[in-house]
Amino acid sequence: MQSFRLHRINREITIKKIRLTGADGKQIGVVNFNEAIKQAEDLELDLVEISPNSDPPVCKIMNYGKFLYEKNKSTKEQKKKQKIIHIKEIKFRPGTDEGDYQVKLRNIIKFLNDGYKIKITLRFRGGELIHQQIGVRVLHRISQDLHDLMTVEIFPNKVEGRQMTMILAPKKKPV
């Protein structure tokens, strides 16, 4: 049973004429397949089909195992360099008391210092929905209290369902 490969190599290539690139990366030109496979075998390397859709297909003489190793290594390096953005959510209500507000504010400051984005959700219950301006004031107060630590990415213009949502991101620290 043959395993799936990204590229056809050596005798798997069925085209008679190919555009050949040498092991050093220089263009050799359009050659017969048998001549190309002979050159690869003389160098004890593989003939790898790089671009099968071009006319004629492009093949390169290389060490296929080393090529796959380098490719896997570079994709792992790229994954390491990617930064995953975590979002922490803090919930408020229009009538959140001062003590609770301060505790939640401390948590937001801690999360911002740790580099997290913050999703602040302001939930309305019952008749509170009539007083949307109170909710907007709470969100403005939060942004005023934290203006030196964060930037507001999304500020709500209206109530969505029974809640308003604001997204905060930590300010970039000077290097």
Curated annotation (Swiss-Prot):
Source organism superkingdom: Bacteria
Q: Matching SUPFAM superfamilies, A to Z?
A: Translation initiation factor IF3, C-terminal domain, Translation initiation factor IF3, N-terminal domain
State one molecular function term (GO): ribosome binding
Q: What InterPro entries does its record include? A: T_IF-3_C_sf (IPR036788), T_IF-3_N_sf (IPR036787), Translation_initiation_fac3_CS (IPR019813), Translation_initiation_fac_3 (IPR001288), Translation_initiation_fac_3_C (IPR019815), Translation_initiation_fac_3_N (IPR019814)
Which stretch is the leader sequence? none
Q: Where in the cell is it found?
A: Cytoplasm
User: Which is a Gene Ontology cellular component entry for this protein?
Assistant: cytosol
**Sorted alphabetically, which Gene3D superfamilies does this protein's record hold?**
Translation initiation factor 3 (IF-3), C-terminal domain (3.30.110.10), Translation initiation factor 3 (IF-3), N-terminal domain (3.10.20.80)
Q: Which UniProt keywords apply?
A: Cytoplasm, Initiation factor, Protein biosynthesis
Q: PROSITE patterns from the entry?
A: IF3
Give GO BP annotations, semicolon-separated: ribosome disassembly
Q: How does it assemble?
A: Monomer.
Give the record's family classification: Belongs to the IF-3 family.
Q: What PANTHER family does the record tag this protein with? A: TRANSLATION INITIATION FACTOR IF-3, TRANSLATION INITIATION FACTOR IF-3, MITOCHONDRIAL
What job does the chain carry out? IF-3 binds to the 30S ribosomal subunit and shifts the equilibrium between 70S ribosomes and their 50S and 30S subunits in favor of the free subunits, thus enhancing the availability of 30S subunits on which protein synthesis initiation begins.
What this protein is called in its record is Translation initiation factor IF-3
Q: Which organism is it from?
A: Blochmanniella floridana
Provide the taxonomic classification.
Answer: Bacteria, Pseudomonadati, Pseudomonadota, Gammaproteobacteria, Enterobacterales
